[in-house]
Amino acid sequence: MFPYPSGAGLHVGHVRNFTIVDVLTRFYTQQQMNVLRPFGYDTFGLPAENYAIKTGISPQSATETNIHNFRKQLKRLGYAIDWSREINTSNPDYYRWTQWCFLQLYKKGLAYRKESYQWWCPVDQTVLANEQVENGHCWRCGTEVEKKKMKQWFFKITDYADELLADIDQLDWPDKIKTMQRNWIGRSEGAEIDFEVVDSKDFIKVFTTRPDTIFGATFLVLAPEHPLVSKLVNDDTKQKVDQYRTETLKKSEIERQENKEKTGVFTGSYAINPGTGEKIPIWVSDYVLMGYGEGAIMAVPAHDERDFEFANKFNLPVKQVIEKPEGSTDSDECYHGEGELINSGHFNGTRTEDAREQIVAWLHEQGIGEQKVTYRMRDWLISRQRYWGCPIPIAYDEDGNEYPIPEDQLPVIIPEVEDYKPDNTGRSALAKATDWLTFEMEVEDKKTGKKVKKTLTRETDTLDGYACSSWYLWRYVSPHDDKSAWNQEAISYWAPTDIYVGADHAVAHLLYIRFWCKFFADQGLLPFREPVKTLLYNGYINAPDGKKMSKSKGNVIDPLDVIDQGYGADTLRTYEMFIGPYDMDAAWDPKSVGGVYRFLNRCWNLCFGEERALASDSEGNLATTGASATSSPVTTGRARSVARGTEDKDRLCIRNKTIKKVTDDIHRHNFNTAVSATMEYVNELYKTGAEKEDLVTLAKLLKPFAPHLACEMLEKLDSDDVWPVWDEKYLVADTVELVVQVNGKLRAKITVSVDDLEDQEKIEKLALAEKNVQAFTKDGIKKVIYVKKAKLLNLVA
């Protein structure tokens, strides 16, 4: 429950997510549990800053307006939110503690600064976020962008890579989310090998998962950004390599990894293959990424598809070093499987599975290789050259030395500025706040170690918004605490989070909160190592045509429009739970909304004897509203005063079965079938007439989905809202329905006692007493098939 409060407000797709949480909140509250259901806003980010640049309206002002609109929508939807715990990441009382979290990571060496490439617009003279680059051009001015090296802040999430990966197995999360996190972390075991550069003192470090194939390495490929590239070129190759590097820096990593024709440039230099002692050429190509391993690969085209394609393109040698096993059906030109080594010196004949360890040991003896584990996941880049973000609590002296802001001087407040555009060096608009930018602070001099007063310059980068949302779950337990980020007694009582409902950021936010949880557990500040016990990953509500709702497409449906049309909040909430399994995408269907409205009217009519008229057009839109007096099954003869006996027992069976069904369905998060079971119960009450206890049960079962209607009913019935409990003895009915077939076709359904199921002769007599069965068995019965478990009697005539 931590949305970004956009100017567009909520649409009906958001309502599904929030209603799931509300259904569970009300359900467990009715079961008399203590339920924490707070709400907050993830308010930092580009949209508010871009809006400020465009309109001059400050992000602070625009954010407050948007939050007011969100709050209004949420209250209209009837959510049981504890508004006393409302939080907002751009409130200084909140981001004070985000800055404190940063400093804890900084103290332990897990927040650090290094150079990194960023998108840069040479005309606007500013850094661009990935989403601001459109087909290689600046979204504002259309200029072709380039990559520029800048100092950036990172969190060392890779220090926790092994634990983050290992603990995925214990999570009660959807398999697809766990798989995405495993793949994102991307643990690879292999070897790091040094390749000596010919006529140079340099070595190129290469990571490979297949050290057993080293004798088949016929060339090396470096990422164009590799720091050694500039030293490997010569006068003949420098221009081509520089041009290729420039073109590569315009591409995203996704574009570089797409299956397409390989490109590359020869550097002019060679390396020595430590296995064969042969000279092999060194190339650069964009299919090698700087972030994986060491940004360099040994290419074995006989046994790797991408290397094979590259070798074919540039006529490079292919050397087979694994013999394909006899009977292998692998028809690929390059063999990827296991087998015996060939053309591999004294390792010939060794199985590849054994050779990996033996070859690494051999390389280690020579001092040019060792076992290594690497990860696809990189350290988390957390600095942004934006105004509207949490200021990083770091300052610098004139020599560039870093000084953390003392905790008792937090928060570092975001200053008001007149111009929200970044300055012409790519720094954020914070750099223009000169009164804020420089200040005096007593620090320990880096050279002398003495306490001195220095004039310092504040960091003008701000934190990635994900930093603010990496700890909000713990702030909820004590949102007004001004002594700590979270109260230890409260965190022990309320956390970790039992149920988290969300549909995005599987490998961003959901990974980052796990990282921070483990870090703060190591500091003794959290009594658990995983932040969320159960994750529900809900599907989207799409537009009626199946397309995703978005403001740009003009297909957004405002929940308040649905409510004000006459359907009301209860209809909208119940429809969104009834539309299908919560984890599946669904298309908005106006006609079905009308159906749910009619169902709730039937519930009203059962209790109050008054059903609001509904006339709808072909699209399900309300044509008229109002009320038409109809008789209630409670207040007329339809609510028969039932004599004690079988009919009472049947009523109790139906009621208790419904209670169990709805309870189990909500526990299993099958919200759609819980609503369906309630609908079936209403149908039964219309058939039999409803007694007070039936209506009390109905109102209690309805309350998580349609709280407004349910509360009206419970007040009328003078009842509490405690969740009903079924009685096991009423789950088995005294009577059952038995199907009678003649020659395999349905001819009758008869009601028999459970005891009579044991008496086939009696069952046959009851069946033959049915006129329709008699009509089809005039010529006699040749054979009788009775299946007791299936409650089926088939007469062969």
Language-model features: locations:
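Basic, alpha-helical terminal appendages of large translation-related enzymes
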Residues: 223-226, 238, 316-333, 357, ...
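N-terminal catalytic cores of NTP/NDP-binding nucleotidyl/phosphoryl-transfer enzymes
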Residues: 1-57, 87-101, 208-209, 274-310, ...
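Alpha-helical recognition segments enriched in aromatics with Gly/Pro capping
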Residues: 269-275, 279-292, 321, 435-440, ...
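NTP-handling and nucleic-acid-processing catalytic cores
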Residues: 12, 98-318, 323, 422-439, ...
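Intrinsic disorder/low-complexity segments
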Residues: 200-201, 609-649, 653
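Residue patterns forming the tRNA-binding/recognition surfaces of aminoacyl-tRNA synthetases
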Residues: 53-211, 227, 296-409, 418-420, ...
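Helix-rich, typically C-terminal accessory recognition domains appended to large enzymatic cores
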Residues: 42, 107-108, 112-121, 187, ...
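Conserved phosphate/anionic-ligand binding catalytic regions in large, soluble enzymes, centered on
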Residues: 204-226, 380, 386-393, 461-474, ...
